[in-house]
């Protein structure tokens, strides 16, 4: 649970009954896991689990800002424990450990625990200058109580190092050892770190002052089962193409955001790029700039599911199941080898044939792309510079905005993204319609899945495929400054 921290060396400790002893810095997170578990009111249990047996573990703590207390912990089956009493709600307990590894004693970094918050933490983040509150609204209308609505927040608060959020808003580095720590999750005989909390534990949390690649999973009736790599450098999200994935029978959805106080403006969005689990809304507010915008879906889940089934073509109906509607790019049906792998291929062929005999010209945002297809490639210029080449895409390339549409130079990728949007929206053969939203999804073939979510999204906005932000059609919300929002409110529907 600790991650790869820089650890200070404490050389002289007054250990209980041991006089003084030299201590060296602790090793990496692979050495141990630790935490604090709330018990009765005013009481908490500090625990420490070394990866190799220890002859002794001492805990040192500063309760309520008072004097240091030092205790030899009790070994309970390999997990060392110490109960602390007399903690007032909201008070902070600072603690650290000294432990044996068959040689010099090792000392851990200092951690903090807020009484009444659930567990202790070794990570950064939480409230402070540049932070803002993230509030969760349970709009499931009694279908799921707050104790059944789970939140899992993951992101990089330190570049290159993934962390997860605890109920008090502090961030802790992910660790594969959490899979064997007290309170870990188990499903189908496999253990997972418990990185989720419920709305009954925290209905609002402070955002880290910086987070890259932030993802807020919301799951109903179950926490998320997320494995962590053995080197603690990555984690595994739900695999929608794997029926054996532990989250395949879990109702979940998510919100994405990135924010670095003073450097990178807040940008976040609800998304259906990979799937729809249940309706979510996001309200982003910033009083200083007057920004106040809400995006997402306000229909009930039953309405979304029934309207989807009635609206899309036959090829897209099998994407719907009890737990979710899977996006074409995340379904084996629409990928190579699937029954719908060629769903858009005739349209792609016709478009490439059209631009063999007709000049391709796209002018947007002060830039002009001009070219013609020869063989399987579109050779083009941008504002007269070039030439550049865009290979003919496949249907799986289009639904995933990948392959030929995401290859080559930046300029080639730029036009590839434009073609991806045009193919999905059904306007590829008329560049005059590429930036005309009223023309989107009005002809076939097209991406029925993406088109449907644009019909039900607030202001017709949705993130239905990876480049759905082209021509500002997505649900993304971006501030025009790098100051913190006043608030982010996520509505959880059903």
Q: Model features per residue range: what roles?
A:
Residues 70, 93-111, 116-494:
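Extracellular low-complexity, O-glycosylation-prone Ser/Thr/Pro/Gly-rich "stalks"
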Residues 1-26:
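Secretory targeting and sorting signals
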Residues 24-126:
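Glycan-association/targeting regions that enable binding to alpha-glucans and other polysaccharides
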Residues 3-9, 36, 47, 81, ...:
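Short, flexible coil/linker segments at or flanking structured domains
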Residues 11, 73-74, 427:
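Intrinsically disordered, low-complexity regions enriched in Ser/Pro/Gly/Gln/His and often acidic
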